[in-house]
Amino acid sequence: MSQESNDLFCEATYLNFTAMHGIQSIITRVRALADATLSDELIPPLSYFIEASNHENPVELEARDLPFAVYLISGNAGSGKSTCIQTLSEILDCIITGTTKVASQNIYCKLSNSYTSPHINTIFQEFGFKGNHVQANLGKWQYVCSTSPPTMKELQKKDIVYYWEVLSDITKSMLKVLDSETGPGKFDVIRTLEDLLGKPRGNLSWMTFGIHGSLPSFTRSNIIIIDEAGLLGKYLLTAIVYCWWLTNAVYRTPQYKRGLKPVLICVGSPTQTSSLESTFEHSKLRCNVRISENILTYIICNQTLRSYLDLSNNWAIFINNKRCTEPEFGDLLKTLEYGLPITEEHARMADNFVVPEAFINNPANLPGWTRLYSSHKEVSTYMSRLHDYLKTSGNNKFVVFTLPAYTFISLENFERYRTAANQPHITLEKWLNVNAGRLSNWSQSRDQDATQTRCEIRSQQGLAISCSDITYVLNSQVAVTTRLRKWVFGFCGTFENFLSVLKDDSFIKTHGEGSIEYAYRFLSHLLFNGMINFYNYLQQRSLSEHAVKTAYNKLATLTNTILFPQRQLSAGDGENFNDVIVPTDLCHFEGKGIEDVDIQQRHENVDDVIFSALDDQMIDLLYCNYEFGHAETSSEIYTQFSMLKTMFMGRYSIMVELFGRNFSTSRFDSYVDNVSSRGCEIFINNMRGGMLSLALQTDSYTLMGYTFARVNAFADEPIRRKIQPHVAEVLGELNMPTIVLKDQHGFMAAVNSNINDFVESVDDHELKMAVTADYGISSKLAMTIARSQGLSLERVAICFAHSGLKLSSVYVAMSRVTSSKYLRMNINPLRETHSRDDNNISEHLLAALRDPKVHIVY
């Protein structure tokens, strides 16, 4: 480490090892598990999977041990589990996944903050789960273990039989690779090359993934990280292991040849909301949602599994909440997390958060706070009450408006469904009503305030079109329910906000993955169009006349210095705006008032009339002397961006020096073209110059309205989604608006419509029943406690149910905030009758904390 420093930069180096000591032993243990090899007789042969694919009844399958290992990482919210994943990904070659899209994107955001990271898939995508498996009839077959306690082979067979409808389809699809010429031979070619070059086996296997980019991730590594694993049902543990062995047996990978086994690193909290499983009974037209044992509880509580996995030596517990800065509140959350005894002191602290239930349910109170409820019905009721209140309150900021959402039902497949499901008398309206939660996002369908559906039959296209109007609130906080394409076309915030965007590379990181040139070109466009905001600010009459004159002089001098660096102005020249030459051939400005000029004689252009009324000082020389061209090469693009960025930062410094915070917090808007609004509708002449990006569930958005402006990048959506031509034709006729969202940084974007296929499975029939088209957003003003898990919310007001209280739900709800100052509750759940639904998991956790073999990370 250098001890010297120059005048510009300090050369001292600081290394952060604060968390490394606790994580180092985890890395060592995971590496040991991953490097352990099996004898040949323990490796599941390819013939096992070929034979399994021929069985119609999975109960007849041979009970076989599918070897695997698990390292468990548990802990409460904000304790450092994600940081541990980041360290593991940096040091080990591993496959990182999440249980849901939100979990995957959360961990992606964590990784991409430090370095460039590929997108993180869900564990379902990695093991081969497809869209047509969503409607699979799980549990169609059942296997009863013959011994008590059951052996590991029996536990695995029980899970495989339960999940066989999905695993059977995945197995048959994977075995088709054997029939292709290059499928399983991809690694054989590399092995031949290793033999020719005299290299050890596996030395060049990494080249395979560079040559064949479409290889399944399971062929690359045997270390699989699953974030938020507590949301997975227990049978998925074996399903993942089964698919790993299947994939590697088919491709004959180096790790399969070496006898390596899959190592699952399960990360999460076993004491939060339960894993849920849903099935649809066509005979009763009813969707059944039931609680199932999650993977973490299964691993911790099942004695056979604990012994097989040697859990005590393969378990790390993170026990400190680093998000919460209040020790007393953090202690309360820890008590709820681990099921520790609740004291009177804890109860008295919770008393401080209690307010009347009517106070929380009144939309006039706690504006901007997120309401959490136990049921979707309560959420829907509050949203209706909120919308009614806003309609009559006269609030100009939070305005209520409605947008149409559509469902296109295939009449032919609907008739086939009625026959297959033995429902000859079911109507379209009834079918739509009972399947609302399956057609779109479950929470979205239950929570939103929507009108009664209206149906229209179009016999020529063979379609029934269902339409309902959904109510939204302008300027409210929303989240997208799935990953959607968006077209970023502007910025709306403050000067200070935009400066932070320029100083921080986060925008370039998140939007420059495809081509960084697009991101720089877009920012240059906003910089050029938004530079006039500095001069607009100076038009305020409340500003000091002397400060305004000084600002005009300094802005003009700065602009000329940057645009014409070869023109060396003396210090005296820089003091007077009159010394700066405005090119008259570009501007034609006379500098006289309109009243002094004969308009008909002196002006041929209306713009000249307008500008002649301005004082010379009001003219931004940038627009007179610089033509914003379309830079082509990378160097030209960055040079243009660098020049405009330098000018913006220079102007910002001048204005802050003269006007302070009053300027920096003033509004700064810039768009790729002229933008105006009327009510909730936004008008923009042309979207050209914007850039394509993705709207993620992990981002926070503000609903700014809607627009009918055409976005060319979205025109191929029906083709990309493989929507039937007649549906695409009708969708085009309806001309659905595009919603406009502002992200947490201030960037404005038009978000593509959320278009999805709905495929119904009835016995052995797969029917393409419907196509849905909505906006893919849900409000953050109110949601269920279960939906809030994993979200960080600034201000929360909770309405607990008065009966059936579960401490796991109480913990999830209360731990959404980082400060107890922004927490309100209708009751004190610690003083009410409550229960635990965690299968005595707390006792196991407390025992683990006392176990010297379990690794504790503070």
Curated annotation (Swiss-Prot):
Disulfide bonds: none
Pfam families tied to this protein: Herpes_Helicase
GO process terms (BP): DNA replication
Coiled coil stretches, renumbered: none
Keyword Nucleotide-binding: yes
Residue numbers binding ATP: 75-82
E.C. number(s) listed in UniProt: 3.6.4.-
Family: Belongs to the herpesviridae helicase family.
Quaternary structure (record): Associates with the primase and the primase-associated factor to form the helicase-primase complex.
Protein known as: DNA replication helicase
Source organism of the structure: Gallid herpesvirus 2 (strain Chicken/Md5/ATCC VR-987) (GaHV-2)
